[in-house]
Amino acid sequence: MTSGLKAPSARTRSAPMTDHDIYLFREGSHMRLYERLGAHLDAVEGVAGCRFAVWAPNAARASVIGDFNGWDPAPHALQARPDGSGIWEGFVPGAKHGQCYKYRIESRRHGAVLEKGDPFAFAWEEPPRTASRIWSLDHDWQDAEWMANRAKVNALDAPFSVYEMHLGSWMRPDGNPGGFLNYREMAVRLADYLVQTGFTHVELMPVTEHPFYGSWGYQTTGYFAPTARYGTPEDFMFFVDHLHQRGIGVILDWVPSHFPSDAHGLAQFDGTALYEHADPRQGFHPEWQSCIFNYGRNEVRGFLGSSALFWFDRYHVDGIRVDAVASMLYLDYGRKAGEWIPNEHGGHENLAAVSFLREVNSAVYREYPDVQ
C-alpha cells in the first residue's frame, strides 16, 4: 500500500512519555495525559518548535499538517512508538504558538485517509472552522485568597445557590444581537449580576469546544479547550479568575456521555471505532444521533479522566456536573427490546461506566478535596 507520504523529515525523538507513562496509559489510570499527548511547544537540540503525539493504533501512516507546512503531509510524518502503544510522535521545527494543525491519518482499514483535530488540543479555530491550534496555556492567577479558602465555601454545609447559564445566549453585545461577548466582558458583567442577586456559584453549560452552536455545548469535540466563540483560553482563565476574586465559584457541565460524529472529531478516529464501541447497539445513541464512549477501553478512560482533572488543574474550576449520567449507566437507555446488549450478568447496567464514574470521582476528590 502506498500513500504518497515521503520518509519523515521532521526531527523526531522518542517522546516525552516514559515507560511508566505508557504503563499507566495502557492501564487506564493515567489521569494527566494532556501533559504528554497533543501539541506542546518545545526545543530539540536548541531548535524551537512543537512536539506532537497522537494515539492512533490502527493507522498505517500518520503525519501532522498545518500552517507551518502549507498543509502538506509530506514534510512532517510522525513515527509510531516501538512499544506497541499505538502512539505516533514527531517534532516540527519552527512551529509556533497559535498556528493551526490537524493530524492526517491513513488507516489500515480500507486505506481510508482522515484529517482529524487533536483530541488533546488546548485551543481550536472558531467554528465552523475545525482545525486545532498550537497553544501554550499561560495566565497570572490572582485568586490565591479564593483558592486558599474554597474548602469552606464549597463545604457541604455552606450556603449554596447556583445560577445555571449558557454563556452565548446570556447576554449579547450592544447593537449586535447575533454576536458574542468575550469571556472577559462576560466575567465583569456576570460577576456584578451574581453578587447583586446573591448567588454563590455559577454553573456553565458546556464551554468545551463544539461544532454545533445549537447543541448548547453538549456535543463536544474539544475536551481540553474552551470554545473559541468567546475568546482564547487565557480569556476564559480570566473569566474564572475574576469570578473567584468576586467571591463566586465556577462549576462546569462536562459531557463524557456521548460525542458527535463530525468528520474532524473523535468518531472513527483512525478509521476504526477507537473512542466509541464498534457495535451500534453499544456505541451509537439512537435519540441523540451521537457516539457513545467505550468506557471499557482503558485508553478511553484515561482520556476522559484526564479531561476532568484538566479543568481543575489548569482553570481552577470548583466542580464539574456530569451530564446525562442515566444514559451512561443503563445499556437500554433510549432503546427498545433487542436494540441493546446485556452486561455479563444479563442486566442492563453499564458496569464499565459505573466503574469509570467511580474512578473519576475518586481521582478528583483525591487531588482536590476542596471542590464541589
Across the structure, where does each feature detected by a protein language model lie?
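Conserved alpha/beta catalytic core and glycan-binding cleft of carbohydrate-active enzymes
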Residues: P128, H316-D318, G338-Q372
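Short beta-strand elements bearing conserved aromatic residues within extracellular beta-rich modules
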Residues: A62-V64, Y101
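The feature marks proteins involved in alpha-glucan
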Residues: M1-G49, P82-E164, S169-F180, E185
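Substrate-binding/active-site clefts of carbohydrate-active enzymes
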Residues: W146-D157, H166-E349
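Short, acidic Ser/Thr/Gly-rich low-complexity loop/linker segments typical of extracellular
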Residues: P73-S85
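Short proline/glycine-enriched turn/loop motifs at strand-loop junctions of beta-rich domains
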Residues: W55-A62, W71
